[in-house]
Amino acid sequence: MTAERRPLIAGNWKMNGLRAAKSELRTVAAGLAGLSAETMICPPFTLIGAFAADVAGTQLMIGGQDCHPAESGAHTGDISAEMLRDAGAVAVILGHSERRIDHQEGDAIVKAKVKAAWRAGLLPVVCVGETLVERDAGEAAAVVTRQVRQSVPEGATAVSLVIAYEPIWAIGTGRTPTTDDVAEVHGAIRHILAERFGAEANGIRILYGGSVKPDNAAALLATANVDGALVGGASLKAADFLAIARAVG
């Protein structure tokens, strides 16, 4: 982390949470005073409006978990970036491995969704990451570099893009790469961002995600070119999420 990149701790609730979960959200919002990091919770779409209203005036931001590339139209079951913004979201996670795998979303569709997020005034958090087979073959940096190259449109700036590195084999498994492994991949991401966007790359935040917990957060967040975390399961519990946010140096 550097002075020009304010840390971001974002919680991805995935397909979890009912309206009763507002109690956890309120606990998080109440516990953020004095923290140096920006914080965000990305709940299911059904909760965005209620959550955004509940935390209005606090430091906690609300984001979405996906959006359709189109602004509107005959896309049953989909949500547009404009709908997310209208509901109170300020950002959206795009290209998560669970979307890439479960819905066969490739880099081209992720790129289109990033453009949609920009169109609606949302901050896209673009996820990239390798499989265990790719990691064991020594291809992690190459895979992630390719994903950044193909998933992120031209014109990205320090205030319009966040990248989240989530090694697929570490998501929800309790396994994490070493801090050296994380530093290597984050360094590769920083390099391709600099190659594409010049000086703007110095301000683009790169988050780490994949089994981030209170007991490993400090080490991960102290790693070179790690500017925050995209937190999965641990973000569902206010105490755990706050502990991770407090681990920012």
UniProtKB/Swiss-Prot annotation:
Domain of life assignment: Bacteria
InterPro entries associated with the record: Aldolase_TIM (IPR013785), TIM_sf (IPR035990), TrioseP_Isoase_bac/euk (IPR022896), Triosephosphate_isomerase (IPR000652), Triosephosphate_isomerase_AS (IPR020861)
Active site (UniProt): 96, 166
Single GO BP term: glycerol catabolic process
GO molecular function: triose-phosphate isomerase activity
NCBIfam families for this protein: tim
Sequence similarity: Belongs to the triosephosphate isomerase family.
Assembly: Homodimer.
Entry protein name: Triosephosphate isomerase
